[in-house]
């Protein structure tokens, strides 16, 4: 005798349903649930449970699913219905009529990849949560180091006092009435109050929208900064304040990528923001490879070859991206390299996008901006050919990096030079749709580009804090570099700038084969093993792009101290010994 019990859009047909009791072990329950949740058909056995009815396609496309060797038996051997908790876990009692499914959402979003916050980052946060709950006694480490992302203050970089004091008044202007108390008790200097009053006069309140392009006074401060840096004038009308440089990249890419055939030249290895954004916009990433053997320098012939190859495929290449100093490579471009890229952009009518968010993170040589490079070329055009007059350049900067490290405040800017006024109007419209960048972030941009100067009350502390952060970063970068030099199968370029090292790693054949069996790329497998053994999260080179046949990983050197460097070296030796 059989009975049928409706459950939503499906029904369970149970053989000889009775009541009371069940002799399944926890292991059997787990196996049963796993079979259903994985949507795998099984071989029918006697006295089994059979799923039938119109809801069957939710589990599998076959007419029915048969669960092997799992009868529900009571004391008398009769078959019993499923317990309620299994029914509730596997099926909803309401019809499954969701409008959005993984198959009908924007597939360009689904295809986009952002390795910096991928599987490894998720797993590291699970470990961190476990340790915070006091449940990590089974782990071989007692702390998690997030060396996967340039997030300075997460790794204990202290905020610059002047910046935060100004921000505190911006958030609560009533503090201006307590100037004497703040000065005496918390060390607020006179110039802190002066700056806060100036900014409040411009933005009125950080809780109010600003102009879409950003507060006028702050854009003027940015223009003044660019002029001091480069020796050439800058127009605040050409400057847009943004929610970090990433927001500026998103705006520019949305304007540039007009059709699915649009292409953008991107350096490889690159920050995955670019490939992910192009993927979402259904446009083409046109990779050009940096020269690792020459300190990750830009090879202009390589860029030209990549451009021509893409054009032969029918790709309409409209822009070239340069990251200077590099991410993940840390390389800083020389002035001549910048001139070469600008010359190519002018010849091929490409928009040049200069990602310069690490411009203060330069350890070797000095930073050369693309804006200065363009103005130098225009001034040295002795034949007055006008070759560079129509070149479009967008330069980006951010409060997230450098010695500022205010990632969470989401502030940045981009300057646009040489753009058609009608295009600029469309960019203005695009940013207006998002209303404006966070106003507190705009204020942080202002103090970044206009910090305390010699002779001002806050300057001594500002200078002390700034130099300490810079020197600490440089010291840790060199400690990590020296450790990599001693590690078997690892080679690394000396740290030139930014917040990262991007070493090459050569793994034993047995390790490569084991990675393949695990369904992982070799560098990803190495990084996962490192995380499991040490709690240190780094990013596989594949997430940034790398030449075929090479393996890399990216690590920041933001974490304080050098103890964690020892964790890496010990793990690496054990890993290499394991797979000899």
Where do the PLM segments sit?
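N-terminal mitochondrial targeting presequence
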Residues: 1-98
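PLP-dependent class I/II
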Residues: 2-5, 71-213, 217-580
């Amino acid at each position: 005798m059989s009975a049928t019990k409706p459950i939503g859009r499906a029904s369970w047909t149970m053989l000889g349903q009775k009541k009371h009791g069940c002799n399944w072990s926890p292991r059997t329950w787990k196996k049963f649930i796993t079979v259903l949740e994985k949507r795998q058909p099984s071989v029918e056995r006697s006295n089994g449970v059979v799923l039938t009815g119109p809801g069957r396609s939710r589990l599998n496309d076959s007419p029915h699913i048969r669960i092997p060797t799992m009868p529900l038996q009571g004391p008398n051997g009769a078959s019993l219905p499923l317990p309620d908790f299994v029914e509730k876990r596997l099926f909803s009692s309401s019809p499954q009529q969701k409008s959005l499914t993984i198959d009908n959402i924007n597939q360009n979003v689904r295809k986009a990849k952002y390795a910096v916050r991928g599987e490894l980052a998720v797993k590291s946060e699970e470990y961190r949560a476990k340790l915070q709950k006091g449940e990590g006694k089974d782990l071989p480490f007692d702390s998690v180091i997030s060396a996967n992302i340039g997030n300075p203050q997460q790794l204990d970089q202290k905020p610059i006092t002047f910046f935060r004091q100004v921000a505190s008044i911006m958030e609560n202007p009533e503090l201006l009435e307590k100037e004497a108390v703040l000065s005496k008790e918390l060390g607020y200097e006179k110039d802190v109050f002066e700056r806060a009053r100036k900014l409040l006069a411009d933005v009125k309140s950080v809780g109010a929208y600003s102009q879409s392009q950003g507060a006028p006074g702050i854009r003027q401060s940015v223009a003044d900064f660019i002029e001091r840096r480069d020796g050439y004038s800058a127009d605040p009308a050409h400057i847009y304040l943004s929610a970090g440089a990433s927001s500026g990249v998103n705006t520019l890419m949305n304007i540039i990528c007009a059709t699915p055939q649009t292409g953008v030249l991107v350096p490889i290895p690159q920050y995955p923001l670019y490939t992910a954004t192009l993927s979402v916009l259904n446009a083409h990433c046109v990779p050009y490879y940096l020269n690792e053997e020459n300190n990750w320098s830009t090879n202009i012939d390589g860029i030209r070859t990549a451009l021509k190859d893409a054009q032969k495929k029918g790709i309409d290449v409209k822009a070239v991206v340069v990251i200077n100093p590099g991410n993940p490579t840390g390389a800083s471009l020389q002035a001549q390299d910048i001139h070469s890229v600008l010359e190519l952009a002018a010849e091929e009518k490409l928009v040049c996008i200069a990602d310069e968010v690490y411009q203060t993170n330069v350890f070797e040589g000095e930073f050369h901006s693309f804006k200065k490079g363009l103005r130098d070329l225009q001034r040295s055009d002795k034949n007055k050919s006008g070759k560079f007059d129509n070149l479009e350049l967008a330069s980006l900067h951010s409060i997230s990096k450098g010695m500022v490290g205010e990632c969470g405040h989401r502030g940045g800017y981009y300057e646009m030079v040489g753009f058609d006024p009608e295009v600029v109007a469309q960019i203005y419209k695009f940013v207006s749709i998002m209303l404006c960048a966070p106003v507190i972030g705009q204020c942080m941009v202002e103090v970044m580009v206009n910090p305390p100067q010699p002779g001002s009350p806050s300057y001594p502390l500002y200078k002390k804090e700034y130099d300490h952060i810079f020197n600490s970063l440089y010291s840790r970068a060199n400690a990590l570099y020296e450790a990599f030099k001693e590690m078997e199968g690892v080679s690394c370029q000396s740290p030139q700038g930014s917040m990262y090292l991007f070493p090459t790693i050569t793994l034993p054949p047995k390790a490569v084969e084991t990675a393949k069996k695990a369904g992982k790329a070799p560098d990803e497998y190495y990084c996962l093993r490192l995380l499991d053994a040490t709690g240190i999260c780094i990013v596989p080179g594949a997430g940034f792009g790398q030449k075929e046949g090479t393996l890399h990983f990216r690590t920041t050197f933001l974490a304080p101290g050098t103890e964690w460097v020892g964790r890496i070296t010990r793990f690496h030796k054990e890993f290499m010994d394991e797979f000899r």
